[in-house]
Amino acid sequence: MSSGLWSQEKVTSPYWEERIFYLLLQECSVTDKQTQKLLKVPKGSIGQYIQDRSVGHSRVPSTKGKKNQIGLKILEQPHAVLFVDEKDVVEINEKFTELLLAITNCEERLSLFRNRLRLSKGLQVDVGSPVKVQLRSGEEKFPGVVRFRGPLLAERTVSGIFFGVELLEEGRGQGFTDGVYQGKQLFQCDEDCGVFVALDKLELIEDDDNGLESDFAGPGDTMQVEPPPLEINSRVSLKVGESTESGTVIFCDVLPGKESLGYFVGVDMDNPIGNWDGRFDGVQLCSFASVESTILLHINDIIPDSVTQERRPPKLAFMSRGVGDKGSSSHNKPKVTGSTSDPGSRNRSELFYTLNGSSVDSQQSKSKNPWYIDEVAEDPAKSLTEMSSDFGHSSPPPQPPSMNSLSSENRFHSLPFSLTKMPNTNGSMAHSPLSLSVQSVMGELNSTPVQESPPLPISSGNAHGLEVGSLAEVKENPPFYGVIRWIGQPPGLSDVLAGLELEDECAGCTDGTFRGTRYFTCALKKALFVKLKSCRPDSRFASLQPVSNQIERCNSLAFGGYLSEVVEENTPPKMEKEGLEIMIGKKKGIQGHYNSCYLDSTLFCLFAFSSALDTVLLRPKEKNDIEYYSETQELLRTEIVNPLRIYGYVCATKIMKLRKILEKVEAASGFTSEEKDPEEFLNILFHDILRVEPLLKIRSAGQKVQDCNFYQIFMEKNEKVGVPTIQQLLEWSFINSNLKFAEAPSCLIIQMPRFGKDFKLFKKIFPSLELNITDLLEDTPRQCRICGGLAMYECRECYDDPDISAGKIKQFCKTCSTQVHLHPRRLNHSYHPVSLPKDLPDWDWRHGCIPCQKMELFAVLCIETSHYVAFVKYGKDDSAWLFFDSMADRDGGQNGFNIPQVTPCPEVGEYLKMSLEDLHSLDSRRIQGCARRLLCDAYMCMYQSPTMSLYK
């Protein structure tokens, strides 16, 4: 096979890429123009379709004796651009491309591609699927469970899908990972009990235990398959009513899961008849099917042309998107039995009626009433159709079926369109009203030849200022909503059209093609083509002007019905049942938008059910405060904290106001758009803007007091400790660094020991519900660890001694200190006097009244895969926990809105009652509900003093 290699340079301006992919069926020999070396591109390589900007399409115009070629960028050699003959490639859809690209051996990749049933079943393999894994060739397969599905490195236009499998039974210990890939934890399992493999090494275990084994085919199996009875691009006919219609075969094969029914044929009709989109049962069988003119029928309903006819220029028609090239399917084709017969047999197949609704005759117009959008001259938005004279012969269509079962925001998801033709009273074929995406702009289809490449788009918008990228609406009942992806004027039409990508699938729509020409690319059944003058700005939003970016969209569009209140009155947090009723549900908490989860979750933790920092909201402005101090404080108090406590909801618009203020700080940037760390946010807000008196005052080894707003635990991992508590971690850190609190804090924010967002020092951390900081305070009376009397000395070297209150800070009275350090192992210990308050009442400690300084846990901030969520305690009961996610759900697509949600998670209380030993032995994957995230993903734990929270 020969092909032209244009260069080994990076593909930039000369081409633009589309998300269409092809598999090479023949080996390529190409020359690198830089090195003049011959490069081999093996069969089984995958290329991405590219288009030449200068000519508007990727095919090299055919000359006499030469066939069409298409341009490809080989994914394995991303700088190589080459042209290949159409016959030497086959198109595959993106989902199959992802599965195949993970297989590095091109021969094995091609073999799996030809085994299309196995490949189709690969789409069913997901997290939780039971599988068998072939680790080494010729050896037995090991059972396992899929724990991860996705790309390992997302660095290409499309990335290969790998499967992370936890090996079970005899496979345990035979793997090579614990779920970590290049330092990133993709799933969790025991050491050497996990593997990352591609689909060719997997076998899905199904209910009947057959799995994919019967479908597995090696390269040698594929040559024994019967070829289909009809060749691609061959001409055929079929009876439609009383007339005969002709077309070209673009698909001929058995249907996945329906092999016993025999062959089915996809025909691209010469006239606009049919409504097959190339899919069957969710599997794309043919990528060149057009809902405007393609039909799928059983082979019994097809009549091959017996006489030579002049054909249309052949389309790029292959067994594509999961279907192999002719004769290369690896499962057995059906024999000529009762289920199949010679093409042209006139016994209508049962599945013909199943796939196409009914027979294509006059009865169809009775059983399948089409619906179309009528033209209303008074409202230009209604003028979506221009009926040809043929339409006058058809009786008016009835009203569309009732759609009351759909919610108002979902009614436009699907419409009962029909794309067939009905016989006219005079015997000719008259158009029935077609879908909005076809008939509203079709005109006389036969007067215009098939357009191979899109015309240049028209850059200017309409009178409403609509342009490419605008949120638009096509006013109908119900209306269509979407984003304009293309504006232009196709050949043969006098009107300027707009190509919209709809929010949801709609029957009769395409994937970006119109009349056989691709104008943009989107998901199937989401591309709608209408006259530009019929479009209006999306009426669901307050602003009619398009916005330039996500930052301004948050404000100018007002987020529809997602605005929140402004509350001037100072409001303490509502606790227990009252707080629960206010806060739980969807559209509760703080709405996330554009990488704001770090800020949403931190604010929710600090203020939803705690008043520990309320003084921050009340301090009057002083002369040294910055100019926007009052603006920030007022925003926090009246638009965020108070509404959150009264109504349980704050919209993203208010948070964006705060993010813009954070951007004003000279040392800060990216707060309106980038992902940030909570500690960075707290430092900017508390230190630079609000000038909050530092929450913590810490002294190191008698040195000057250091001020800070939160404390991060730094320590080396102790392999002897399975699940540490926050109490242990804080004490270890203070002892090892020789630190003390100079004052008892009213609010203590502790950052967990971890490096960055990904690496955790401990797999689980137990969030102590109560924190005793008495032994960590300066000038505070403390109990002797032995007798309970007033401690006079502290010994850091005794801390690790397992014989004396293991894992506790050691302080002793004078007598006990002498006794303890008489032991030979402790003779050389260096202990120091405990600092005590000068005015300590003598009778207090003599009567055992040494007070304890304790703090209560009120919130935990967690992170998993760069997304922050929050756990908050709303009452005294152990089960009084709520889980908050600012981006729990979504309304709409790319230009939609996040929906925050707060849910009760009482199961947390049960896990916090468990012993540390039981918690350590518990498999993290078996932890129910949200509790796993609390125990495994803690980022910050927040404590408050029950007696001081309103005074500091």
Swiss-Prot record:
Organism, scientific name: Mus musculus
Protein name: Ubiquitin carboxyl-terminal hydrolase CYLD
Stretch list, region Disordered: 311-350, 386-409
Induction statement: Up-regulated by TNFRSF11A.
Family: Belongs to the peptidase C19 family.
Reactions listed under catalytic activity: Thiol-dependent hydrolysis of ester, thioester, amide, peptide and isopeptide bonds formed by the C-terminal Gly of ubiquitin (a 76-residue protein attached to proteins as an intracellular targeting signal)
Signal sequence region: none
Record EC number: 3.4.19.12
The protein's role, per its UniProt record: Deubiquitinase that specifically cleaves 'Lys-63'- and linear 'Met-1'-linked polyubiquitin chains and is involved in NF-kappa-B activation and TNF-alpha-induced necroptosis. Negatively regulates NF-kappa-B activation by deubiquitinating upstream signaling factors. Contributes to the regulation of cell survival, proliferation and differentiation via its effects on NF-kappa-B activation. Negative regulator of Wnt signaling. Inhibits HDAC6 and thereby promotes acetylation of alpha-tubulin and stabilization of microtubules.
